[in-house]
């Protein structure tokens, strides 16, 4: 009875929601036009940046050293910290920002890549009549619209499908999604809609067909998170903020307030991580925007302060692009343990995640095999049984730490806030914590408002609504065509440059090397499967990239797309960076080692490679073992029991295939488990066993050897009696 009432109530609410949405559609269209006009007006009110290009890191450090006192010093170069710096500097405040690692090196680069209002939070707001959750959704939807407007090259609307497997869920979820559209109002990207079972399968052919009723499609935003964070920091630098990465805060400076006699935070002792040099940076106001490390800085101010951050780890995996449609994501609203899983196309790959597990705060979070397998199992539940979801198809994996917080001023100290908290300590340290990527701008605005009030700073109102981020102002969807026409770039590379750098893509194109081919004329790729080119390494240094890890993970996104491809590109990236930054051989070796450790531990290479180790079980039929042994011995002509690069080169030359030595080294290195420069028979059999089981998606060596064997077999001499007679 209760169930029937619930369903009837849902349908009644659905009817009301439909009438309301239809009735307000014309009004929403009118309001959207007004909002667009407001964006134009806001952009016109903001003065041009002080610098056409961001100053060099060396120039920024000199500014930090030589400025007697800043108005605001921001600690933390993630999305929120960079947003605070941009908000402060565009209000006319003398602003500095320091980050102990690279911009976006923490949580801000390890997100689900969505700019969303939070459908789940709206559900909680309605079910629990929670006004705070409603306000959070309303704010996030406004910020979503703003972010899509100010960085159109880095973001775009994305349709997300919600498959429905029980008939009563259709009106239930439809009402919820329509309310999501309604709350968005003039900020609604596109109206949600219902799909029949057949239409849903047209869009997503791999979807589980059994018991599928239909689907609901709604719209949220998607972005390139690390590049977005970098664009915010670079925009702040262009407007005059002294921003420096690899600048660690060692301690907070304090001085006695002559009026109250109390100690006040007055700056920070900073250390250049790259040189070891230490110096003081003084400021009227210090802002702690360090995400998961919030309490570390708070304890520098007061060692007895109560911790407010409750870190939670969210793991994501990347799979080949064929696992999802190119232009539509999928949402599993209720996993086996009550979590939500997204399945999204991104950069021609597929992202699946996330988990939500309590964790310790660390600079180097590692994705666990347990979390990776949990996500794979949830993916299997939603895909057709005809599709084999294999562990070996995980191309990269990462863990990001969410800085969930409790409000120190709240009576309920155990209640975790999904919203942000701005706290001012007795000594004047301002802490901004919590929140989410989408609302970084409003979080920054709230923080600077609090700073202006608490420290009597002379500043204008916030000017960041409608303020274009670097690369966004003169971007257009057809900009890539000019890159192809003017510079002779491949279309795929040109599209990538336009979507990564916006109107700054022309500067990257100018740096591109000549290929020596008829086409493309310029743009030498770092790895053949991805559109990243060597010129991006040189340009990345202008964007404050200081290490090889910066380049493979945040200037390019190779590490987040395919760890093996990133590892292959590393030697060339280090060589190019070494030329620009005058690295000696020792420094180059150090960079290679550090970057490989990063890929191995933090980006899932460890989990991926552990699927094939020296202890891997060889589970092959005797006939298979025999076949693979014969293939192996065609290369090991001297019966040594192993093959080297020379053996492979000899066989390839005999069938007329040319391959450069560096590529061959990379191919052998994938299978050389004990790293002795030789691939032994047992290593090769382990590889073939792992490929058959689906633990490893494939191997270039395995494909190469099979192709060579087939070509060699074709060259067997024809018997005389079958040669049409006669010699």
Curated annotation (Swiss-Prot):
Tell me which Gene Ontology terms the entry assigns under biological process.
Answer: camera-type eye development; gluconeogenesis; glycerol catabolic process; glycerol-3-phosphate metabolic process; glycerol-3-phosphate shuttle; multicellular organism growth
Domain EF-hand: where?
Answer: 623-658, 659-694
An MF annotation (GO) of this entry: glycerol-3-phosphate dehydrogenase (quinone) activity
Q: Name one GO cellular component term.
A: mitochondrion
**What pathway annotation does it carry?**
Polyol metabolism; glycerol degradation via glycerol kinase pathway; glycerone phosphate from sn-glycerol 3-phosphate (aerobic route): step 1/1
Segment annotated as transit peptide: 1-42
Keywords attached to this entry: Calcium, FAD, Flavoprotein, Metal-binding, Mitochondrion, Oxidoreductase, Phosphoprotein, Repeat, Transit peptide
At which residues is Phosphotyrosine found?
601
NADP keyword on record: no
- Write down what this protein is called: Glycerol-3-phosphate dehydrogenase, mitochondrial
Native source organism of the sequence: Bos taurus
């Amino acid at each position: 009875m209760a169930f029937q009432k619930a369903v009837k109530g849902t349908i009644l609410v659905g009817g009301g929601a439909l009438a309301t949405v239809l009735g307000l559609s014309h009004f929403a269209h009118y309001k959207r036009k007004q909002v667009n006009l407001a964006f134009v007006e806001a952009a016109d009110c903001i003065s041009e940046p002080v610098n056409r290009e961001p100053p060099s890191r060396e120039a920024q450090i000199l500014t930090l050293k030589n400025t007697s006192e800043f108005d605001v010093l921001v600690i933390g170069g993630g999305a929120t910290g960079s947003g605070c710096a941009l908000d402060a500097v565009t209000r006319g405040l003398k602003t500095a920002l320091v980050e102990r690692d690279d911009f976006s090196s923490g949580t801000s680069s390890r997100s689900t890549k969505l700019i969303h209002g939070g459908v789940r939070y709206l559900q909680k707001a309605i079910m629990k009549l929670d006004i705070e959750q409603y306000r959070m959704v309303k704010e996030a939807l406004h910020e979503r619209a703003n972010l899509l407007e100010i960085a159109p090259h880095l973001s775009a609307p994305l349709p997300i499908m919600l498959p429905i497997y029980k008939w009563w869920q259709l009106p239930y979820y439809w009402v919820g999604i329509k309310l999501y559209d309604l709350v968005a109002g003039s900020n609604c990207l596109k109206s949600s809609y219902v799909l029949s079972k057949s239409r849903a399968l047209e869009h997503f052919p791999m979807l589980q067909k059994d018991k599928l009723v239909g689907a609901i499609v709604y719209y949220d935003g998607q972005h390139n998170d690390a590049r977005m964070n970098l664009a915010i920091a670079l925009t702040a630098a262009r407007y005059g903020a002294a921003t420096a990465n690899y600048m660690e805060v060692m301690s907070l400076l304090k001085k006695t307030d002559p009026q109250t006699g109390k100690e006040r935070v007055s700056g920070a002792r900073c250390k250049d991580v790259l040189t070891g040099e230490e110096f003081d940076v003084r400021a009227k106001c210090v802002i702690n925007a360090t995400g998961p490390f919030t309490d570390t800085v708070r304890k520098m101010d007061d060692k007895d302060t109560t911790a407010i951050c409750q870190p939670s780890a969210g793991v994501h995996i990347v799979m080949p692009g064929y696992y999802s449609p190119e232009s539509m994501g999928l949402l599993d609203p209720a996993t086996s343990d009550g979590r939500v899983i997204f399945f999204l196309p991104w950069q021609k790959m597929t992202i699946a995640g996330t988990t939500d597990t309590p964790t310790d705060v660390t600079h180097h979070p590692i994705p666990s095999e347990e979390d990776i397998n949990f996500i794979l199992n949830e993916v299997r539940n939603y895909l057709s049984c005809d599709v084999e979801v294999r562990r070996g198809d995980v191309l990269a994996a990462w863990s990001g730490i969410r800085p969930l917080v409790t409000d120190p001023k709240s009576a309920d100290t155990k209640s975790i806030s999904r919203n942000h908290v701005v706290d001012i300590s007795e000594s004047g340290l301002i802490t901004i914590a919590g929140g989410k990527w989408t609302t970084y701008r409003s979080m920054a605005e709230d923080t600077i408002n609090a700073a202006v009030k608490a420290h009597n700073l002379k500043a204008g109102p916030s000017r960041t609504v409608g303020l274009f981020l670097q690369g966004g102002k003169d971007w257009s969807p057809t900009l890539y065509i000019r890159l192809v026409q003017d510079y002779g770039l491949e279309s795929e590379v040109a599209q990538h440059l336009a979507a990564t750098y916006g109107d700054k893509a022309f500067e990257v194109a100018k740096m591109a090397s000549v290929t020596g081919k008829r086409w493309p004329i310029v743009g030498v790729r770092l790895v053949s499967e991805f559109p990243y080119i060597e010129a991006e390494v040189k340009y990345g240094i202008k964007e404050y990239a200081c290490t090889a890890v910066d380049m493979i993970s945040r200037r390019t996104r190779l590490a987040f797309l395919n760890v093996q491809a990133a590892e292959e590109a590393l030697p060339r990236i280090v060589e190019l960076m070494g030329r620009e930054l005058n690295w000696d051989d020792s420094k180059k070796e150090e960079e290679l080692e550090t970057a490989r450790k990063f890929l191995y531990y933090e980006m899932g290479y460890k989990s991926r490679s552990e699927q094939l180790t020296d202890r891997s079980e060889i589970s092959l039929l005797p006939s298979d073992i025999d076949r693979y042994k014969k293939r192996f011995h065609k290369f090991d002509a001297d019966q040594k029991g192993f093959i080297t690069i020379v053996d492979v080169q000899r066989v390839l030359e005999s069938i007329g295939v040319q391959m450069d030595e560096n590529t061959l080294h990379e191919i052998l290195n994938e299978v050389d488990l004990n790293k002795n420069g030789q691939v032994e028979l047992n290593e090769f059999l382990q590889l073939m066993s792992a490929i058959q089981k689906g633990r490893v998606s494939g191997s270039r060596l395995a494909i190469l050897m099979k192709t060579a064997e087939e070509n060699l077999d074709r060259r067997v001499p024809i018997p005389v009696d079958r040669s049409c007679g006669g010699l």
